[in-house]
Amino acid sequence: MKRDRKEEIVQEVAEKINRSQGIYLTEFQGLSVAKMSELRREFRKVGVEYRVVKNTLIKQALKDLAGADKLAPGLKSTTAVAFGFDDPVAPAKVIRKFSKTNDALKFKMASIDGVVFGPDQLPLLSEMLTKTENIGRAAGLINGVVSSVPMVVNAVMRNLVCALDQIAKQKQ
């Protein structure tokens, strides 16, 4: 690969790292082309880009990032990077699900907002709620509160009317 092309790749990877909410490093040695295509399809479904990049080029792209040196141990053997642009935990869910049926895919490490997660923390990451799930829960909570306010107001009004009715009956 020519130097110009390498510099172009470094720039592309650095730009994707800067745009990503989560960066995941995986090892894919032994994964067939068909399985790799299937994995990429699964990543695309959740808005994640998965790309094979040489370790030296990833190191150069990470050079300007704070805390990037913490990812250096993960840059050994074959490396592919999953860029989680919209949701930082979406790649973890795909990696965990796919690696259950494909031993060749191994999670190396991840970085989410500068916090580095090791290979033993994949289950923790994959069980976190996605951005969409969090929004759904928040909307449900808000909806519950909003719908209960009229019921509370109606109950107070009903109790007031009953109390006034009782007072009126006593005065008669």
Curated annotation (Swiss-Prot):
A GO cellular component annotation in the UniProt record: large ribosomal subunit
A GO MF label: large ribosomal subunit rRNA binding
Pfam families assigned: Ribosomal_L10
Highest taxon in the source lineage: Bacteria
Swiss-Prot/TrEMBL keywords: Ribonucleoprotein, Ribosomal protein, RNA-binding, rRNA-binding
GO biological process: translation
Subunit structure: Part of the ribosomal stalk of the 50S ribosomal subunit. The N-terminus interacts with L11 and the large rRNA to form the base of the stalk. The C-terminus forms an elongated spine to which L12 dimers bind in a sequential fashion forming a multimeric L10(L12)X complex.
Biological role: Forms part of the ribosomal stalk, playing a central role in the interaction of the ribosome with GTP-bound translation factors.
The family this protein is said to belong to: Belongs to the universal ribosomal protein uL10 family.
Identification of the protein by name: Large ribosomal subunit protein uL10
Organism encoding this protein: Pelodictyon phaeoclathratiforme (strain DSM 5477 / BU-1)
